[in-house]
Every structure is written in C-alpha cells, then in structure tokens.
C-alpha cells in the first residue's frame, strides 16, 4: 500500500502517495541509526542556540531537552522502537520527540535542515571514531616495538624481488612495517582537525535565518572550527573520503605485512608460527594449519579500498551542495571503519602471539648474501665500487661453477680475480659484522634499530 506523503516531514508540497518500494529505497534508517547518539547531542545544542535567540522559550527548551534525554536513554537501553514511517534517524528522533512532548517538538527544526543536521551528526560520529581507532594503531605499534626490542639479536635474510639479498635484523624487518603505521597515525591525527569543523547553522544551503550563534554551537559540540561557507558545509564529503583513504592506506600496509607473514609461515620458509588463536585447519587435510587471519587481513584490504573508490565515484558527478547521492556515504564509511578497526586489533593479536623459529631463520643465512660485503672489502682497499661489484660477481660465478659456497673459495682463488684480496678476507663472512656495518641512520645495525624503536615510542606517547 502506498504511503501518504502528508505524513512526511516534507509532505506538505505533495498530494500523491509515495510508491512503497520508493519509500524503502529512500530510507537510510538502518545505517543512519549508528549516529543516534550524535543526532540527539546535536539537537540539544541546537535547541539551546534557538533559545538564545528567543526562537523558543526557556520552558520549551527544558521540555525539548528532557524529551531528548529520554530518547537518548531509549537508544542506549535498546528500547527505542523504530516505526515503518521512519525515513532516517533524524525523522525517527523527531517523531519520538513529538510523541513525548507534543507539538513543541516541531520548533526544534526551526532554521535547521536535514542537510546541515546529517553532516553535523556524521562529523561528530567520525571525530569520536577517530579517537577510538587511534588507540588501536598505538596498541599495534607498542606490540611491534616491544617485539623488536626483545628479538633484536635475531639476524635473517632480507629479500628483494622475493630473492635472498642481504642479512638484516629481524627487528629491522619489523620496524620496516611499523614505520608506515606510524605515518598512518600522523595522518589520522592531522585528519581529526579537518573533520572537527562545524557545519550546523548552514541550513539547507544558504545559512541560518535566525542568526544562531555558530561559535556557541562549535564550543557546545566540541568542534575545533567552523565551516565558513554554508553551501560547502552541506555538500562536502571530503572528510569522509579522506578518512576512507586513511583506512585504505592502513589496510594496504596491513596487507603487505600479512603477505610477508603468510610466506614466512609456510613450510618452505618456516620462519614464524602463528598462534592457534589466529589459525584454522582444513576440513579434509588434518595436518593443515592455515593462516586465515592473515589471509582475511589481506583480503579485507581490497574491500576497504573498494569502499573508498565507490564513494569517490558516487560524489564526483554531484552538483554543488546537498544531493541525495550523499546518503550513500554512510554504509561504506561505517563498513570501512569497522573493517580497519577489527583488522588493527586482529593484527595486534597476531603479532603479540607470533612465535619465531630462530633455527629456520638462521638457515636462510647463506654466504652469497655477503657478496656485496665482498665487493665493499675491495672498496676499502681503494678500488671503485663498479669494479669491485664485477669482481665479486665473478667470485659468485666461480663458487657456483665449483659447486661450493662463496666463503669456501681460497685466498688464492680470490687473488686470481684481483691481487688485493688477502688473508683478512675471511672476516667478510660474518653475518653479525655485516649488519653492524650498516650503521648510518635507518640502517640494520643494532643501535640503528634501537633508534627506530625509540623514535616510534616517542611519537606514540
């Protein structure tokens, strides 16, 4: 049965009924109720601003505030009852407020549009959620730094192109993934200020005709600033897209780390073992222990990036100010927030319970990883690096042709490649000394890795 338009907040203009499917299609109540707390808080502040301008009396203000407090309690206790006619959380709250206090509830919307109301709610919600997810990033960084500090003496093969490259500390590898997350933390903190800008008082698009005190509203709601153009205030969703970009970057960083751990946990590598708490088995192969937590983290990164791209495409063709297309911002935002929040917490659990296998890690260290060190040995004796690179490469080929390892070549073998090789060349084939030579800022020497750990710790205080 078609729903009468006259019952709608906007129904006075219409004489015909709304098509039932259109009525459902138009709703955003189930996604929008995520912001029920913010909607009530915003309405309380706006009611006070109206009272300041004598649009409503003190008595009416008190009645509205008491009604809103009851609505707040009903939402918090799960007792708020949604009606089929509720189009969104704003209309649901106004309908319930009217039931509680009568027609005076209709004064609350004076000078206010759902356009500035919804973006106020959304900004308040996102400000709260940014503070929440910030804690999850910090907790993950703490786990990374604690683990790196404890296991700083473990040396492994580093990889480029997924081929063994040079020795590095395990902790250096961990810090290579922690530092991008530290960058994410910085971006999140910068983003907060851009989200924390007041749109309320912008009206539908042209501003508020009752001269409400927007500075009062800013302070009352805890915003850091005020959006200075009313058209921009109601039509802007950059803050949503920017958060979703942030979430996408976090998930990208999580995905790359997850991929490394998936590889390192395989039988072929065996560097790490996941806790049972973050693994699953096979329904047919009893021996299997699958890194499902890591695979899901990798998979969900695509989901969050898809949320961001989808909203950007939705917004890109919309005309200036508010359009109904913008109703489609909430579901991808809420999904991206939940996914990135859950993922950060899951990864924190994975890293904190991970077991490293030092024997397997040590087996990845082979003399060919020190070919660059062999070239640098000759550099220290005065030869140009391009020449020493070629000589070291010839030594690698010689070892391969003799089916032996680089460290097994005799001094005379090496001297046949260049006379500057001497007995002290044996010192090259020491993995600990190799990593300690990489001692400039950002290197894999022990004190450099400790500096990286302290850099992160000082940033998350």
UniProtKB/Swiss-Prot annotation:
Disulfide partners: none
Catalytic site positions: 161, 282
Q: Which reaction does it catalyse?
A: 2-(N(omega)-L-arginino)succinate = fumarate + L-arginine
Q: Where along the chain is 2-(N(omega)-L-arginino)succinate bound?
A: 28, 115, 160, 290, 322, 327, 330
Q: Does the keyword Lyase apply?
A: yes
Which pathway does this polypeptide act in? Amino-acid biosynthesis; L-arginine biosynthesis; L-arginine from L-ornithine and carbamoyl phosphate: step 3/3
Q: Where is this site: Increases basicity of active site His?
A: 295
Q: Name one GO molecular function term.
A: argininosuccinate lyase activity
SUPFAM superfamilies, A to Z: L-aspartase-like
Q: Which GO terms describe its cellular component?
A: cytosol
One Pfam match, given by its short name, reads Lyase_1
For this UniProt record, give its keywords in alphabetical order, as a comma-separated list.
Amino-acid biosynthesis, Arginine biosynthesis, Lyase
Taxonomy, superkingdom: Eukaryota
Q: Give the enzyme's EC designation.
A: 4.3.2.1
* Record note on quaternary structure: Homotetramer.
Q: Please report which protein family the annotation says this sequence is part of.
A: Belongs to the lyase 1 family. Argininosuccinate lyase subfamily.
Could you tell me what this protein is called? Argininosuccinate lyase
From what organism does this protein derive? Answer: Schizosaccharomyces pombe (strain 972 / ATCC 24843)
Per the record, the gene is: arg7
């Amino acid at each position: 049965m078609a729903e009468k338009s006259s019952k709608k907040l906007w129904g006075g203009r219409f004489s015909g009924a709304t098509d039932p499917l259109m009525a459902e299609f138009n709703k955003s109540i189930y996604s929008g109720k995520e912001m029920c707390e913010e909607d009530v808080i915003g309405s309380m502040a706006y009611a006070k601003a109206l009272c300041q301008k004598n649009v409503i009396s003190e008595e009416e203000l008190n009645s509205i505030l008491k009604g809103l407090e009851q609505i707040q309690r009903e939402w918090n206790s799960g007792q708020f009852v949604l009606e089929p006619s509720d189009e969104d959380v704003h209309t649901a709250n106004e309908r319930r407020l009217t039931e509680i206090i009568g027609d005076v509830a209709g004064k609350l919307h004076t000078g206010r549009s759902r356009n500035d109301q919804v973006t106020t709610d959304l900004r308040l919600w996102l400000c709260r959620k940014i503070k929440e997810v910030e804690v999850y990033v910090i907790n993950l960084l703490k786990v990374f730094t604690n683990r790196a500090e404890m296991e700083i003496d473990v040396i492994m093969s580093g990889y480029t192109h997924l081929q063994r490259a040079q020795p590095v500390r395990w902790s250096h590898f961990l810090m290579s993934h922690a530092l991008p997350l530290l960058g994410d933390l910085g971006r999140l903190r910068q983003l907060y200020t851009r989200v924390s800008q007041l749109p309320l008082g912008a009206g539908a698009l042209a501003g508020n005709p009752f001269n409400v005190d927007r500075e009062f509203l800013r302070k009352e709601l805890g915003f850091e600033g005020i959006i200075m153009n009313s058209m921009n205030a109601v039509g802007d969703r950059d803050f949503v897209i920017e958060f979703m970009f942030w979430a996408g970057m976090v998930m990208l960083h999580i995905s790359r780390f997850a991929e490394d751990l998936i590889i390192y946990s395989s039988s072929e590598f065996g560097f790490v073992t996941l806790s049972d708490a973050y693994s699953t088995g096979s329904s047919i192969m009893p021996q299997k222990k699958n890194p499902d937590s890591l695979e899901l983290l990798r998979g969900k990164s695509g989901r969050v990036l898809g949320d961001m791209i989808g909203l950007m495409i939705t917004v890109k063709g919309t005309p200036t100010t508010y359009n109904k297309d913008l109703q489609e911002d909430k579901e991808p935002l809420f999904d991206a927030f939940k996914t990135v929040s859950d993922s950060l917490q899951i990864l924190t659990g994975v890293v904190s319970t991970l077991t490293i296998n030092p024997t397997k890690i040590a087996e990845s260290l082979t003399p060919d990883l020190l070919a660059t060190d062999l070239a640098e040995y000759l550099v220290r004796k005065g030869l140009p690096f391009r020449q020493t690179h070629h000589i070291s490469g010839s030594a690698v080929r010689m070892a391969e042709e003799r089916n032996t390892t680089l460290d097994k070549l005799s001094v005379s073998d090496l001297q046949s490649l260049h006379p500057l090789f001497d007995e002290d060349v044996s010192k090259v084939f020491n993995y600990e000394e190799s990593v300690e030579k990489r001692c400039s800022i950002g290197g894999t020497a022990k004190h450099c890795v400790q500096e990286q750990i302290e850099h992160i710790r000082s940033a998350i205080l």
